[in-house]
C-alpha cells in the first residue's frame, strides 16, 4: 500500500491566515519598524508563509497599504472627543500618530486614489454641519485633510529624526499648539470668508 504525501502550496498555507491576520501583522511591522521596512517578504516571513501566499488576500502591496490606511483612519471615530470641525481634525491627527508613518501611509494611499474616503467624508460632514454648501464643505474638508496629513507627516519624521539624534541643535520642536493654531486658522478663515460680502 502506498501513502501519497502532498505538499502544501503557498496558496493553501495562506488560508491558515485571514486577511485580517495579514493586515494586523503588517500594522505591527509598520509600527515597529516603519514603512520602509514593511516589505511583502518581511511580512511573509513574520507569518511563516511564502511571499506569493500574501497575494491570496491582497493582489499587490498598494492594496495592502490601502487596507492599512483604512484601519488607521478608522480609529479616528473612537478617538473623537466632542463634535465639529476641530474635534474631527484632532481625532484624525491622533489616529495617524497612533502608528509610525501613519500619515505617509494614508497620504500615499489617497494620492493613488485607493482606500476609503472616510477621513475626507468626516471632515466634509463636519464643515457642512456648520451650514456651508456641499461644494464649500468639500473644498474646506479637502484643505483640512491636506493640512492634517502634512502636519502629522512632519511630526512623525521629526520624531524619527529625534530618536536617532540627527535633528540640528536649537531646531524648533513641533508641538500640539502649532497643530491647533493651523486648524483654527483654517476654520476661522472659512467663517470669515463666508461673512464677507460677495
Residues covered by each model-derived region:
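Basic, helix-initiating cap at the start of DNA-binding domains
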Residues: 1-42, 46-48, 59-66
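Hydrophobic alpha-helical bundle segments that form small-molecule/ligand-binding pockets
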Residues: 117-167, 190-198
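Key DNA-contact positions within bacterial/archaeal DNA-binding proteins
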Residues: 50-53
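N-terminal hydrophobic signal/anchor transmembrane helix of membrane proteins
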Residues: 63-95, 173-197
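Alpha-helical structural segments
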Residues: 20-28, 32-33, 46, 63-80, ...
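C-terminal peripheral helix-coil segments that are non-catalytic and often amphipathic
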Residues: 1-9, 157-198
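Hydrophobic alpha-helical connector segments
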Residues: 77-116, 141-144
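Residue-level detector of well-ordered alpha-helical segments, enriched
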Residues: 64, 68, 88, 101-102, ...
